[in-house]
């Protein structure tokens, strides 16, 4: 148990520092992709091997310089072979008086043999400070000297015998060999020791015998690099032999390996920093998203009475902050809509209950009526309540589907001047016989004679607003000399419709209440229940859905008294022509 607790501490610490975001899918993706980018970068650096290529080039230049020096020292130690001189008798007869009988051969005719006893000390002295292997071949590419077998006097020689049972390479060694081969070019020739000591298997040696120096990079069976350079040993213009200098197997690989270890160490530190920064980044993303998600779940499970608060990240000034603001606004609108639906349901229940109660009372009383007059009066009450219920249900249905209908419909251009003219004319014809009212329509273009009255919206619903306002005004104008004026004007950005009447006006405390659902304040003499109280509420709802406003105010006369009511509908207008 102690061991388990000891192992649990790091995870507990990580959870405290970064929260549960460490184990989230988003966090794992951020860490993974950041590490993949870093791994690709490091892998590309190792695969391109620019450091190794530069190291090989530097080693080739170094070996060529070293080879030129050693080849010069070897050629200087060579002597002319004068053990036998051939004299041509015919040339002897051609000699003039005073000429020497000794032949004077040209440089090409002289031979400068490489004497091993003289060259070996020179080669040993120049090679010993380095780990370079030197091999000297004669003009026939036969091996004369090998620095591996140059020994000074009195030196004790020791040879390590191979083990009786050679151990198989470990998994780490095999992986190292495979990794080296993976990062090395696949076109490098395989290094082999020359059979019988003849250097003709080396192309650079054969080229050097023609006087051209060269360099070749080979690889051993273990994947280790060997760099070889061949330099001709020349005396005057005669090639006496070839000096072949080679690096020890693994010398370059050790340097490259050390460089790769340094890169891996840097990669480890960078990966650690990358993971920490990724965790910090994910904590600033995943944790807020998790809190927003949890709050959204609580909103879904809760009700309108207990409002759940969405976390406020608006101070972040980023996409998460914008998401937080949007969710908060959406949640507020959702709660307001739920509350409105609940209030609407309560109001509907209350409004339906009144006519139902009256209807029930009339139905229960009808069998008890003693005469026909009482029965007729009760039947009139029943019919009146039925009509009232029908009107209520129709208006309630219209109000309930209004939002959905406005959300589904496509807004179109509506010419208010034409729409209002048609509605006023229809209203004159339909209502003219019931209450004589003077209904005027005025278009005000004083500020701009060419002003257009085009708005974007739903013609049927905008017409419903105007119809409700005209009918509402008609119910309040006096029986004699009643007048309603519909006036259309425009400001720079809005079209404004005024519906004015010369009725009694509106009580100051009721100017806002008249737009509440089921609120009725009818004039004296009008039958109770003729209006559902939803007309003005629906009209304001339609106006707000169009981005407009609907308000009411009283008209003050010259003496300061109220001379009527005015309803003002304002809608966003299109541009001026």
Curated annotation (Swiss-Prot):
Cell membrane as a keyword of this entry, yes or no, is: yes
What are its E.C. numbers?
A: 2.7.13.3
Show where the Histidine kinase domain sits: 347-575
Enumerate the transmembrane spans.
Answer: 30-50, 261-281
A Gene Ontology biological process term? polysaccharide biosynthetic process
Question: SMART domains annotated for this entry?
Answer: HAMP (SM00304), HATPase_c (SM00387), HisKA (SM00388)
Q: Which UniProt keywords apply?
A: ATP-binding, Cell inner membrane, Cell membrane, Exopolysaccharide synthesis, Kinase, Membrane, Nucleotide-binding, Phosphoprotein, Transferase, Transmembrane, Transmembrane helix, Two-component regulatory system
Report the PROSITE patterns cross-referenced here.
HAMP (PS50885), HIS_KIN (PS50109)
Q: Which domain of life is it from?
A: Bacteria
Tell me what reaction this enzyme catalyses. ATP + protein L-histidine = ADP + protein N-phospho-L-histidine
**Subcellular locations according to the entry:** Cell inner membrane
A single Gene Ontology MF term assigned here is: phosphorelay sensor kinase activity
Please name the InterPro entries in this protein's record. Answer: HAMP_dom, HATPase_C_sf, His_kinase_dom, HisK_dim/P_dom, HisK_dim/P_sf, Sensor_TM1, Sig_transdc_His_kin-like_C, Stimulus_sens_dom
User: Which is a Gene Ontology cellular component entry for this protein?
Assistant: plasma membrane
- Positions carrying Phosphohistidine are 350
Annotated membrane topology: Multi-pass membrane protein
Q: Where is the HAMP domain?
A: 283-339
| Functional pathway | Glycan metabolism; exopolysaccharide biosynthesis
Periplasmic face residues: 51-260
Topological region Cytoplasmic: 1-29, 282-577
Known function? Member of a two-component regulatory system ChvG(ExoS)/ChvI involved in regulating the production of succinoglycan. Activates ChvI by phosphorylation.
Tell me how this protein assembles.
Homodimer.
Question: What is the protein name given in its UniProt record?
Answer: Sensor protein ChvG
Starting at the broadest rank, the lineage of the source organism is: Bacteria, Pseudomonadati, Pseudomonadota, Alphaproteobacteria, Hyphomicrobiales
